[in-house]
Amino acid sequence: MLFNINEKGEPLVISFAPFLSPEAIKHLQENERCSDQSQKRTAQQIEAIYTSGQNILVSASAGSGKTFVMVERILDKILRGVSIDRLFISTFTVKAATELRERIENKLYSQIAQTTDFQMKVYLTEQLQSLGQADIGTMDAFAQKVVSRYGYSIGISSQFRIMQDKAEQDVLKQEVFSKLFSEFMNQKEAPVFRALVKNFSGNCKDTSAFRELVYTCYSFSQSTENPKIWLQENFLSAAKTYQRLEDIPDHDIELLLLAMQDTANQLRDVTDMEDYGQLTKAGSRSAKYTKHLTIIEKLSDWVRDFKCLYGKAGLDRLIRDVTGLIPSGNDVTVSKVKYPVFKTLHQKLKQFRHLETILMYQKDCFPLLEQLQDFVLAFSEAYLAVKIQESAFEFSDITHFAIKILEENTDIRQSYQQHYHEVMVDEYQDNNHMQERLLTLLSNGHNRFMVGDIKQSIYRFRQADPQIFNQKFRDYQKKPEQGKVILLKENFRSQSEVLNVSNAVFSHLMDESVGDVLYDEQHQLIAGSHAQTVPYLDRRAQLLLYNSDKDDGNAPSDSEGISFSEVTIVAKEIIKLHNDKGVPFEDITLLVSSRTRNDIISHTFNQYSIPIVTDGGQQNYLKSVEVMVMLDTLRTINNPRNDYALVALLRSPMFAFDEDDLARIALQKDNELDKDCLYDKIQRAVIGRGAHPELIHDTLLGKLNIFLKTLKSWRRYAKLGSLYDLIWKIFNDRFYFDFVASQAKAEQAQANLYALALRANQFEKSGYKGLYRFIKMIDKVLETQNDLADVEVAAPKQAVNLMTIHKSKGLQFPYVFILNCDKRFSMTDIHKSFILNRQHGIGIKYLADIKGLLGETTLNSVKVSMETLPYQLNKQELRLATLSEQMRLLYVAMTRAEKKVYFIGKASKSKSQDITDPKKLGKLLPLALREQLLTFQDWLLAIADIFSTEDLYFDVRFIEDSDLTQESVGRLQTPQLLNPDDLKDNRQSETIARALDMLEAVSQLNANYEAAIHLPTVRTPSQLKAAYEPLLEPIGVDIIEKSSRSLSDFTLPHFSKKVKVEASHIGSALHQLMQVLPLSKPINQQTLLDALREIDSNEEVKTALDLKKIESFFCDTSLGQFFQTYQKHLYREAPFAILKVDPISQEEYVLRGIIDAYFLFDDHIVLVDYKTDKYKQPIELKKRYQQQLELYAEALTQTYKLPVTKRYLVLMGGGKPEIVEV
């Protein structure tokens, strides 16, 4: 029971323990350290759980128990008197929110079982019941709640929907873009706009490249806290700032000088090699050595004296001098080994080459950028207007609305800040600036709890910015008064073999330049238990490389996908694990960088009978055969003269016309017509008036008649029925749904067809009607090279898992294979014609006409694409950001493993040393080398080569073709089947007899205790009421639903576009209103309207509430005035829980419910319940709800040990409020 009231009706105050002081936390840490528990909490975990009263940033390494810490902290808050609904808990995914809620629920149940204090049990039970309504979820979900409740304050209806289908978004975007593009092409600044379009698309007819530019700018702006302000103030920031050589950032100059000095140092190391050949046979310096010494000396001098010799203004001159000094090639050869000494410097020189010329023309592109800024701003506003009109928004819109509500309404913002005791965020490293702004508005400035790991920030494509986490980390370390940093380093997931190789790799690879964090001692993984440190020699990490000196010929042509030989290596290792060590398939996971080009893995595994479950691939729903057949069927129904669709339908299994049939039909041309469609030829063939009627034999004629009859019925039905019903009619008429069940991948095919019907139904429910619009929408999706989400089907559990690294985040697996390690990182974005940056704005490649510079007179123009200075700055930052994220992806992949990690790739064994750098600089790989290497494999090989004297905890092994023969790979061992002829130990009949006896006993028990079996553990008064209804009918008591049935069964057609309001929703809204209504004020229409804004219901439901009737209850009835007179004794919407005994099974069960209102006096209780049911006579409702009110009265009497002297029903379903005493 949840009433915290004593026997006299006075509230009981639970004495909660205070929050722990720093000294108490230290004492607890010491006690934990000295305890004899098998699994102890670490000192840092204890600190993270119990520290309070300030902002806290928890940097939790992989496997360090961050979820455990969050759950324990939440439970501790609850035990210290903080209600669960006063905690804001943000998770990255809906799944994570569900799991967190379940863990909290289990903890509360456990705590209730352990607690002996009755009042604490009541309090914890209240928390358990409030858990479902607590703010535990994604930022998107919370933003929707804010907008649903307060959207009216910024003019947004609470009746909105989320556009989750990218195809629908693209269709609306295309409509807005086309209209806006036409307007700009006819405006006053049209010549500048045309130049802008030509700069990206080449001509004004093909606008696809320009459209992509606009869409990308729009999407990028949506991840900022205020898109409009960002577009107005930051979009052209770099274009305005970087216009001269002096404007180049110092950091970029430092990187160039560092590359020059590194090149000099590397060249010196090469010249010092024993086999280099410094001297000729005569003993004098060799020409090569003299030349290299000159390069070393000049590069060192220019770096040392850069400011006095050149400075920023002379940067262009420095680039020319260095270019003329060093050789054009990258390598220096010593004893037939090539060392790429000059490669990095050449890349840097390329970045700065032609700066003077670029800056000369860069100013010409500024008017184009201003036009682009105007267009994107106009597009953003127009697109939003369309979405407001449709009342359909993207998630980013809803979050921006929520930010606007909190920024513009001080009272709403303060109410949230006062309400939340703490603002908790999981996966903080993946927040974007929009989400960060929302969190800042919800916090009071000193109550944030953020958990994350910057080393696992891998969602840059969602505009996540790890620098948000990084900045907080730096700020809190420099200024502890702003917040506290707690490091969770202990890993409780992986064996030492995995931890050691992870530390070895990333201590040589990751720092703030690449990776965004220095992987030093405070970030290294430490085993959390002694069991993890027990060594297993066979679990040492392996880098297995297929030797590509002799290519197997099975690799994809673009060499980006995984090859057959690499997959065979994996299959061989899995067979060995399964056969020799008994590792179940489900303990093995394959991780890949992307979902595409993985079919070869499934195909190869099938050859070796290894079961595999894939995470899916490219979205090809609309391109699946069965869906294409149905879409062409719908196209034909919409327009039979569409020859392509018609032929596809005729050739489909539904009608099975072959090539010969189609050829005969095609010859039925009307010679008088120039153009004749296939549908007309079919009609002429049926009536025998084609050019060659003799070709139409009886069998073909019969097929044509069936086809035309079926098509006619479908076309007629399409005009009257829904799309959903039409699709199912097609399935049933031609048995197509059943047909695909007999084909390969039958389950997937049927799921796809079923989903097509559901999507058509969803399409019509969203306000779009008709077959034509549906077909048009699908075609637009295909035109934009998009697709609809694939349909998932059930997968086997005992199988190897194949998933992307992104999908694996947060999961763990005993054995992990990281595949395709030789795949180059995608650098597509840094080669686009534009690059966006949050601080700098946009940088573009400008198509300049350099005819005047060249003095050309014969050509009309000489166009050259130039990388403007803002573009180069953004490009460098984007390159480093991409490499940093790839490094973090590798960290995530490696730390998923519990026992062993494998790296799989391919490389040329004879060339494997070419990538290495001969200079060892400290503990890290040289920055220039890390920037130069573009695969996981290259990083690992470079570390293995340069730090070969260390134990790196992984071995490199090349696999030859001879290792991958059928005999070498082997086969899975299958268990020995029982020999049916061997009856020596066959006791089958005895076993069956015993099983039958057991089944009979179980059946008898089930029969004896049937009532108890079907008895729910928890029941509600409404359920009991429903159970009594069948018993009331035979004795002449009418059930209200039956007595109030309309006399006519005819249903009038519903033409109104208004949303139908359910009676149950009105009832819920009335109860909410009666709960929040302030009784200390006079009850009038204004009071009721003010209270109405506070309830969580949509506008249609609020409008349906009869406020005059509610006002009449309080003003015109004695009970309503009783409410106002004795409001201090009034309890509203009070939950209760009592133990009952089922009369049939004699088993106990819990009865839970919520009492609308009751008045608690010293010697008695008055019970009130509101009803909105429609009725003819009040006696009907009195009989219907008598049992329910008796249960309420019993609960109150058990709780307070006082009689319930009066029970009232307040009936709001009639013409006026009526009071019935029960």
From Swiss-Prot:
Which reactions appear under catalytic activity for this entry? Answer: Couples ATP hydrolysis with the unwinding of duplex DNA by translocating in the 3'-5' direction; ATP + H2O = ADP + phosphate + H(+)
Cofactor(s) the protein needs: Mg(2+)
Q: Name one GO cellular component term.
A: DNA helicase complex
The residues covered by the UvrD-like helicase ATP-binding domain are 39-495
Amino-acid positions noted as binding ATP in the UniProt annotation, renumbered to this chain: 60-67
Q: Which CDD domains match?
A: DEXQc_UvrD
For biological process, the GO terms are: double-strand break repair via homologous recombination
Name a GO molecular-function annotation: 3'-5' DNA helicase activity
What is this enzyme's EC?
A: 3.1.-.-, 5.6.2.4
**SUPFAM superfamilies, alphabetized:** P-loop containing nucleoside triphosphate hydrolases, Restriction endonuclease-like
Q: Which UniProt keywords apply?
A: ATP-binding, DNA damage, DNA repair, DNA-binding, Exonuclease, Helicase, Hydrolase, Isomerase, Nuclease, Nucleotide-binding
Residues in UvrD-like helicase C-terminal domain copies: 524-810
Description of how the protein assembles with itself and partners = Heterodimer of AddA and AddB/RexB.
HAMAP family linked to this entry: AddA (MF_01451)
- In which family does this protein belong, per the annotation? Belongs to the helicase family. AddA subfamily.
Primary role: The heterodimer acts as both an ATP-dependent DNA helicase and an ATP-dependent, dual-direction single-stranded exonuclease. Recognizes the chi site generating a DNA molecule suitable for the initiation of homologous recombination. The AddA nuclease domain is required for chi fragment generation; this subunit has the helicase and 3' -> 5' nuclease activities.
Descriptive protein name: ATP-dependent helicase/nuclease subunit A
This chain's source organism reads Streptococcus pyogenes serotype M28 (strain MGAS6180)
| Classification lineage | Bacteria, Bacillati, Bacillota, Bacilli, Lactobacillales
